């Protein structure tokens, strides 16, 4: 919590497993007690240490400290049966289990060593969740719920509002989930919903109406996330497409650096490591970034720099403007890029262009035709890196003839578009 001001944190997330100290199966990270969240007991040793370091003795007291610092608290919570350390259903931790309520749970297993998925076609189960989740999030001052692993069950051997093994299972489970989410929005102050669902599988129009953010994918890799953002943003609003990136995936000093790439370019002032760091962070701020590290090395100054850049410059036009796919889909070889534009905004920035050159094969110069500007106005283009290329052009010229952009070696560029004086 001491890093809050230094790295410009707005939100922090507790992910899978905070409720348990026991792994169900050697060689996996799946844990017991997935459904034992209602008692708000934190059992994971690392998070207990984190709470202790912050001077907190409970989930609520930790949330209170975060709230006092102006930080949103997101807690991951599953709608799965409660299993003990041996992998058997147990009724010792409250009501949400198949021992006490066998009809609340389907025969759907997302993966082995997990509890069966809740069947939200069951009206009694839905009513329990409406009350207990409101108590959990509202009572602990936690504003954001992050779901995962199919909160909306896709199959069930139970018969309730849907048929046993029927084709209407997902319909009624979606209806039940919506009843729960609507209740939380109406009864938990400032409630936010984050959808992960096995790494972004719930990218649909219903989820888009209730989720503040939707996970792009679970790779945690900058190039994969840039690709799924490109694809998903044709349908889902880019301000909702969360980019949860492991910053070591673009750190050339890390064993997690991937994909492997190199350049033959060695011009004055060019640093391959620095170029990859900037390209990775710029990939992450295409949508709402979620920065993480696996294996240490947080790069606090860079996290702070790009967090502020996203918050102050990208997010406003991301919300008010339009996103344009101005170059082909990222493939790790050729130039790719997108741009935001809002010619009618009262803000200074009328557009932002993100360009990426991931290989020497792509060539150093790319002609880029822009979109979404006012053809009758003149615009100043300010390059983040190659400031010698700053220029003034009309919207008509930019959207007809385009502009030539140079990136030597492997790298990226941001172009800020303002109205010319």
Which residue ranges define each predicted feature?
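C-terminal beta-strand-rich structural cap/linker in extracellular carbohydrate-active enzymes
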Residues: 392-421
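Charged, low-complexity surface patches
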Residues: 55, 173, 273
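Histidine/acidic-residue-rich catalytic or RNA/ligand-binding cores of hydrolases
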Residues: 18, 85-94, 155-161, 202-213, ...
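Active-site-proximal substrate-binding groove within the catalytic cores of carbohydrate-active enzymes
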Residues: 138, 151, 177-390
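Structured core elements
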Residues: 6-8, 74-76, 144-146, 192-195, ...
């Amino acid at each position: 919590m001491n890093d809050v001001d230094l790295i410009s944190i707005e939100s922090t997330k507790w992910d899978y497993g905070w409720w348990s100290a026991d792994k169900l199966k050697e060689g996996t990270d799946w844990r017991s007690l997935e459904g034992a969240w209602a008692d708000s007991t934190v059992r994971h040793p690392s998070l207990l240490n984190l709470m202790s370091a912050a001077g907190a003795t409970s989930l609520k007291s930790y949330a209170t400290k975060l709230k006092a610092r102006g930080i949103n608290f997101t807690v991951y919570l599953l709608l799965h049966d409660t299993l003990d350390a041996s992998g058997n259903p147990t009724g010792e931790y409250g009501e949400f289990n198949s021992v006490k309520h066998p009809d609340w749970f389907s025969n759907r297993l997302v993966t082995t060593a997990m509890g069966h998925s809740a069947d939200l076609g069951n009206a009694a189960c839905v009513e329990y969740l409406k009350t207990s989740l409101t108590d959990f999030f509202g009572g602990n001052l936690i504003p954001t719920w992050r779901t995962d692993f199919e909160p909306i069950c896709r199959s069930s051997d139970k018969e309730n509002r849907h048929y046993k093994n029927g084709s209407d299972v997902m319909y009624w489970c979606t209806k039940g989930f919506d009843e729960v989410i609507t209740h939380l929005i109406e009864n938990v102050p400032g409630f936010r919903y984050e959808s992960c669902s096995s790494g972004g599988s719930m990218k649909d129009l219903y989820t888009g109406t209730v989720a503040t953010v939707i996970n792009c994918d679970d790779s945690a890799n900058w190039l994969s996330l840039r690709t799924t953002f490109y694809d998903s943003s044709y349908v889902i609003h880019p301000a909702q497409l969360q980019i949860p990136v492991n910053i070591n995936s673009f750190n050339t000093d890390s064993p997690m650096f991937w994909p492997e790439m190199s350049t033959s370019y060695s011009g004055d002032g060019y640093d391959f490591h620095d170029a990859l760091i900037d390209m990775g962070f710029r990939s992450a701020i295409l949508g709402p970034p979620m920065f993480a590290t696996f294996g240490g090395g947080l790069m606090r100054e860079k996290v702070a720099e790009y967090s502020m850049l996203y918050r102050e410059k990208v997010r406003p036009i991301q919300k008010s403007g339009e996103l344009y796919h101005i170059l082909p889909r990222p493939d790790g070889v050729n130039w790719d890029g997108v741009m935001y534009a809002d010619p009618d905004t009262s803000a200074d920035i009328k557009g932002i262009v993100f360009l990426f050159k991931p290989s020497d094969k792509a060539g150093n110069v790319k002609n880029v035709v822009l979109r979404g500007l006012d053809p009758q106005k003149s615009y100043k283009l300010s390059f983040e890196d190659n400031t010698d290329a700053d220029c003034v052009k009309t919207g008509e010229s930019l959207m007809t003839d385009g502009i030539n952009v140079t990136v030597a070696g492997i790298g990226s560029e941001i172009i800020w578009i303002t109205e010319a004086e």
